[in-house]
From Swiss-Prot:
This is Sulfite reductase [NADPH] hemoprotein beta-component. GO terms for biological process: cysteine biosynthetic process; hydrogen sulfide biosynthetic process; sulfate assimilation. Signal peptide: none annotated. Its cofactor is siroheme; [4Fe-4S] cluster. [4Fe-4S] cluster binds at residues 436, 442, 481, 485. The gene is cysI. Pathway: Sulfur metabolism; hydrogen sulfide biosynthesis; hydrogen sulfide from sulfite (NADPH route): step 1/1. Its EC number is 1.8.1.2. PANTHER family: SULFITE REDUCTASE [NADPH] SUBUNIT BETA, SULFITE REDUCTASE [NADPH] SUBUNIT BETA-RELATED. It comes from Alteromonas mediterranea (strain DSM 17117 / CIP 110805 / LMG 28347 / Deep ecotype). Siroheme binds at residue 485.
């Protein structure tokens, strides 16, 4: 962190995480000692937090926690790993390695696609952790900085028809990811048995600083009119601006984020602020300048107010922007015009301008596993064995089989149909619904999300049919806690877990992902949620304007007031 004192630095006793990072020897801690300790399946003290910087969270199976306690056993500790995949691109060889590891070395045998456009392994026991990292490394994948107080996996819009434009945007996503990565060799030393370099010179993190960032930091590259990455959920966004099909620069949006804390009104979701346009050559400098400004000015005293969105509100958008311009040596130009029209994935076949085809398949909740009559995991592996292109994971937790030559299209489609990757009929509502993992593995979950969503959607489908709305849908998202991984705070109907079987019901976001929904009912049951939606969907069916989306209707009809400036009006009723 810079030694220069700024009036925008928060004074006070630092959060304990700051001590932890400072004393970690650049993220090494005593992780190697914990790995050798077979008396516990978990990591102790600081290492519990430090493994996050290596892409892992310690978890346990909460379904069996009480039973193990009765037997005087510790929780069944295991780790979840989140891979680093800028833009979500995986080769067939990588897919087959991931598939085999999930089968052979995880408790659940699944591959979980996530809203961060990557995959997660769940249920990896301590003896398998090093093997996991080495297996991924052999096929060119790592999990550096996919969690912790760093810049995390960089997202990029998936599967636009303009495949050349996507390629350029994807290359920038990779460059940004590499530029902002931690420079410590801790990951290679611990997991890959890398050589330890002895030096008297203290390791330096030129961008992140040796205390790293105050809090997690998320970055996207987005290609309008698709907003599949949900720009307003992220700290830093590069909105691609093209001229004659060629990428010429980015509009930069800073300070989005959805996490909040129940009962703490100093926390709230926030949309990202528009800083302006930059040409391509300024991209990495601006990315570093935003990160270092947040590094130096972010709140290291109170972690609940440590994210970039709170820094912007505290210091002022203009001051933050001016500091970024100063550090990057640029002046933001006026933003170039663009429009978001949709966030959903384009299911089915899409032909790119290069003559190759992309098949997007729906993966409910992103959970790739073999089910009775729907062998998704086997199907993906069989496709990987013959596929000459690549796979692309989407930020909506779906899968794209990309770059298929015309002569292979029929073979790929036949395999996809055989294994249930292409279903005979999936409702628009199911396609527009999403949930985070939540129970049983996430330690933060207050309520079900992934396991509740399929039944909730079935009920919602029934309500839509009851009111003659079978062809319509609402953007419906469920998140098991207010940290917001399911991005419910950018949905038309959002459920935020409050306790077992209880949720806060939020209404009034829009389909484009540019309006935050307001809380309509607090701490209500699943039955009460559906009763409320039954009434509101009936009103929508009778009173909507032509083509009016549900989120727009509930705002126009006065069911909820729109959230205009969330820092000041999110909690208004």
């Amino acid at each position: 962190m810079s030694n220069e004192k700024s009036p925008f630095i928060v004074e006070g006793k630092l959060a304990d995480n700051e001590r932890l990072k400072r004393e970690s020897n650049n993220l090494r801690g005593t992780i190697t000692t914990d790995l050798k300790d077979d008396l516990t399946g978990g990591f102790t003290a600081d290492n519990f937090q430090l493994i996050r910087f290596h892409g892992m969270y310690q978890q346990d199976d909460r379904d069996i926690r009480a039973e193990r306690a009765k037997q005087k056993l510790e929780p069944l500790h295991n780790v979840m790993l989140r891979a680093r995949l800028p833009g979500g691109v995986i080769t067939p060889d990588q897919w087959l390695a991931i598939d085999k590891f999930a089968d052979d070395h995880t408790m659940y045998g699944s591959i979980r696609l996530t809203t961060r456009q990557t995959f997660q392994f769940h249920g990896v026991l301590k003896p398998q952790i090093k093997l996991m990292h080495q297996t991924l490394n052999k096929v060119g994948i790592d999990s550096i900085a996919t969690a912790g107080d760093v810049n995390r996996n960089v997202l990029c819009t998936s599967n636009p028809v303009e495949s050349e434009l996507h390629l350029h945007a994807y290359e920038w996503a990779k460059k940004i990811s590499e530029h902002l990565l931690p420079k410590t060799r801790a990951y290679a030393e611990i997991w890959l048995d890398g050589e330890k370099v002895e030096t008297t010179e203290k390791p330096v993190e030129p961008i992140l600083g040796d205390n790293y960032l105050p809090r997690k930091f998320k970055t996207t590259v987005v290609i309008p009119p698709q907003n599949d990455v949900d720009v307003h959920a992220n700290d830093l966004n590069f909105v691609a601006i093209a001229e004659n099909g060629q990428l010429v620069g980015f509009n930069v949006l800073v300070g989005g984020g959805l996490a909040m804390t129940h009962g703490d009104k100093s926390t709230y979701p926030r949309k990202a602020s528009d800083f302006g346009f930059i040409p391509l050559e300024n991209t990495l400098d601006v990315a570093a300048a935003v990160v270092t400004t947040q590094r130096d000015w972010g709140n290291r005293v109170n972690r609940k107010n440590a994210k970039t969105k709170y820094t912007l509100e505290r210091v002022g958008v203009d001051n933050f922007k001016a500091e970024v311009e100063k550090r990057a040596g640029v002046t933001f130009q006026e933003s170039r015009p663009y429009e978001f029209t949709d966030r959903g994935d384009r299911f089915g076949w899409v032909e790119g301008i290069d003559g190759k085809y992309h098949l997007t398949v729906f993966i409910e909740n992103g959970r790739i596993l073999d089910y009775p009559g729907k062998t998704l995991k086997t199907g993906c592996a069989e496709i990987a064995k013959i596929h000459k292109g690549d796979f692309r994971l989407t930020a909506n937790q779906n899968l794209i089989i990309a770059g298929v030559p015309p002569q292979d299209k029929d073979k790929i489609e036949a395999l996809a149909r055989e294994h249930g990757l292409i279903a005979p009929s999936i409702s628009n509502q199911r396609l527009d619904s999403m949930a985070c993992v939540a129970l049983p593995t996430c330690p933060l979950a207050m309520a079900e999300a992934e396991r509740y969503l399929p039944d909730a959607v079935t009920e919602l489908e029934g309500l839509l049919a009851k009111h003659g709305l079978e062809e319509d849908s609402v953007i419906f998202r469920v998140t098991g806690c207010p940290n917001g991984c399911g991005r419910a705070m950018l949905s038309e109907v959002g459920l935020v877990g409050k306790g077992p079987g209880k949720y806060n019901l939020h209404l009034g976001g829009n389909r484009e992902g540019t309006r935050i929904p307001r809380m309509y009912r607090e701490n209500i049951s699943e039955q009460e949620i559906m009763a409320e939606l039954d009434t509101l969907l009936g009103q929508w069916a009778k009173e909507r304007d032509s083509g009016e989306a549900f989120g727009d209707y509930v705002v126009r009809a006065g069911v909820v007031k729109p959230v205009v400036d969330s820092a000041r009006d999110f909690y208004d009723q």
